[in-house]
Amino acid sequence: MELRISERKQAKIRIAMQGSAGSGKTYSSLLLAKGLTGGDYSKIAIIDTEHRSADLYAHLGKYNVVSMEAPFSPERYIEAIELCEKAGMDVIILDSISHCWDYLLDVHANMQGNSFIAWSKITPRQNKFVHKILNSSAHIIATMRVKQDYVLSQKNGKMIPEKVGLKAIQRNDLDFEFTIVFDIDQAHKAKVTKDRTGLFVSMPQFLIGPTTGIKIREWCCQNIRERRKEISIEIAKCTSLEALRHVYSKYPLLQKELKPIILEKKRELEKMYSQEIPNLNLIEQSKARQNGIDSNQ
C-alpha cells in the first residue's frame, strides 16, 4: 500500500463506442487508436467477435487481430486481452463486448432455481472481466451494440410500452466504468454522453478520426512531460552512484525511458571518481614521506 500524488500516467484511457449495426464503431475505433499510438498500427490489436469484420479495414494499416469464436465467455475475453498485453500492444479494441453479455444472459436463462441465486454466480464472472478492462496495461476501446429501449407507461388504465431511445447491450451500469463514452449514429457521427477528460463535452456531433486519438493522447501525456523534467533535474543533481540508484528505483514505471539518462550520469560519476582516486594516492604518498615512510625504499 502506497500514498502517492495523482498522476495521469498511472491510468490508461478506457473508451466505449456505442452504436447500432453499420454505424461505424469498428472503423471509428481504428482511427482513434491510430491517433493514440502516434500512427503505429503495429501497436493496435482488435479482439474480433464480429465474424472477422476487423479484416474489412486492413487497407488502413497492419494492425493485429485476435479472432474469437463462440462461446464468448468473460474468461475467454480475459485470455485474449492478456495475449495482446504480452505482445506489447498499446491499444486493445474489444469488438464487441455485447457478445459477452449475451453469453451471460444465456447462461442465466439455462440455470435452474432461484433467479437471484443464479445471478450471484454469474456476476463475479462479469466483474472479473470489467476488472481486467480497468486494469489492463493498454488503452482499451470497447464497442457495444445498442437496442431499442422501452419503459412501461400507464394509459387509460393499461400499461403500455413506450420507446425511450437506445440502450447498450451490456450490464446497465457499465458505462460508469469508462473515461469516455461515444454514441455513434447511422451517419457515423459521434456524440459524447460521458467525458471525464473534458475534451469533448461542449462539442457538437463530429466524425471520429486520428485527431480524436491525438487529443486524448496529449491529455494523457500532459503530466508525464512535466514529471520527466523534474526527474531529469533530480538525476542531474546526483553526486554519488548510490543517490543515482535511489532515483532510478523511485520510478519503476518510467525506468525504460530513464535508463539512457541514468547510464549517461553513471558514466559521468565514474569518470569523476577515476580522476579523484589518483589525486588521493598522491596525497597519501606525500603524507607517508612526511612521516619518514617511502614505499619506494
Question: Where is each model-derived feature located?
Answer:
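Intein modules and their embedded homing endonuclease domains
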Residues: 15, 36, 43, 54, ...
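Nucleotide-state-sensitive switch-loop elements of NTP-binding domains
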Residues: 39-90
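Interfaces that engage single-stranded nucleic acids at replication/repair/recombination sites
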Residues: 1-19, 23, 34, 51-56, ...
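Walker A/P-loop NTP-binding motif
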Residues: 31-38
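Conserved P-loop NTPase nucleotide-binding/switch module
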Residues: 94-124, 152, 159
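Hydrophobic positions on the alpha1 helix immediately C-terminal to the Walker A/P-loop
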Residues: 28
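Residue-level preference for the first positions of well-ordered beta-strands
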Residues: 14-16, 43, 90-93, 139-141
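Phosphate-binding/switch region of NTP-binding enzymes
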Residues: 20, 131-214
